[in-house]
Amino acid sequence: MTDTIAPEATPEGAEAGQAGIRILAQFVRDFSFENPLAPDALRAGAAQPAIDMGVEMNARGRADGLFEVDLKLSARAEREGQAVFHVEVVYGGLFHIAGIAEEDLEPVLLIECPRFLFPYARRLISDVTAEGGFPPFLIDPIDFAGVYAARKAQAEGQQVGNA
């Protein structure tokens, strides 16, 4: 009996030519946490900070036919004009995408792939803010389809304005 799987074997339920997304690797590309006012910012009774969130999705094809997708999440908390904390994570994934029409590839890369990466990036931010002495910062689920549509509309509006 052997535990090796033949290279030509396909994952359960996947047949040749069937559309699918496989995550081959996921990784932290960049990670930063700043806590400039510690320990003073951690005092009890301090006013709730204002938090500014940012999200970016980027994808690029590789020569080997795979795709790298990066999800960048950033959060900056300020109280009385001073940074309380600033966290930024770029979480990446290496994807194999098969059976997807060329016109559908961009939405898959910038909506579905970030959706797979989001829980891991969210956990990193939650963990590091807790380790920084703050309550865990839990990012609400992100509507990646809405973000994609808004950015696409904005880009098309800029192209029309520049024509």
Curated annotation (Swiss-Prot):
Keyword Cytoplasm belongs to the record: yes
Pfam families linked to this entry: SecB (PF02556)
Source species, domain of life: Bacteria
Any one GO molecular function term: unfolded protein binding
Keywords: Chaperone, Cytoplasm, Protein transport, Translocation, Transport
One GO term of the biological process aspect: protein tetramerization
Places the protein is found: Cytoplasm
One term under GO cellular component: cytoplasm
InterPro entries, sorted: SecB (IPR003708), SecB-like_sf (IPR035958)
Family to which this protein belongs: Belongs to the SecB family.
PANTHER family on file: PROTEIN-EXPORT PROTEIN SECB, PTHR36918
Function: One of the proteins required for the normal export of preproteins out of the cell cytoplasm. It is a molecular chaperone that binds to a subset of precursor proteins, maintaining them in a translocation-competent state. It also specifically binds to its receptor SecA.
Quaternary state and interactors: Homotetramer, a dimer of dimers. One homotetramer interacts with 1 SecA dimer.
NCBIfam families per UniProt: PRK05751.1-3, secB
Name under which the protein is recorded: Protein-export protein SecB
Organism: Caulobacter vibrioides (strain NA1000 / CB15N)
Taxonomic lineage of the native organism: Bacteria, Pseudomonadati, Pseudomonadota, Alphaproteobacteria, Caulobacterales
Encoding gene per record: secB
